[in-house]
Amino acid sequence: MPKRKAKGDAKGDKAKVKDEPQRRSARLSAKPAPPKPEPRPKKASAKKGEKLPKGRKGKADAGKDGNNPAKNRDASTLQSQKAEGTGDAK
């Protein structure tokens, strides 16, 4: 089977050798390329000195508030005290 001639090897016969059109779909050429989304910033990693023990992740923040009704006293007494306190403050 004969090999295809390169474009530069044409010997003056412009009628026989035509420039092949670039084959690109009309659908693709009609709309521009979509813009790339901006990269999201990465989360800052925790500093080496601030690591907590593995078992204390959730419990460390709960103790800082000091007004956790489930820990200090039951919720019903806390709500009743709030209701009484609102009537006194005039």
Curated annotation (Swiss-Prot):
Q: Name one GO molecular function term.
A: chromatin binding
Check the record and name the InterPro entries matching this protein.
HMGN_fam
State the compartments where it is located.
Nucleus
User: What positions are modified (ADP-ribosylserine)?
Assistant: S29
- Residues that bear N6-acetyllysine: K82
Give the UniProt entry's GO cellular component terms: chromatin; nucleus
| Phosphoserine: modified positions | S80
- Where the protein is mainly located, per its record? nucleus
Pfam families for this protein: HMG14_17 (PF01101)
Biased composition annotated in UniProt, kind: Basic and acidic residues: 7-23, 37-64
Question: Keyword set for this entry?
Answer: Acetylation, ADP-ribosylation, DNA-binding, Nucleus, Phosphoprotein
By its UniProt entry, which SMART domains does this protein fall under? HMG17
Q: Where are the residues of the annotated region Disordered?
A: 1-90
**Highest rank taxon of the organism:** Eukaryota
Similarity annotation? Belongs to the HMGN family.
PANTHER family named in the record: HIGH MOBILITY GROUP NUCLEOSOME-BINDING DOMAIN-CONTAINING PROTEIN 4, NONHISTONE CHROMOSOMAL PROTEIN HMG
Q: What is this protein called?
A: High mobility group nucleosome-binding domain-containing protein 4
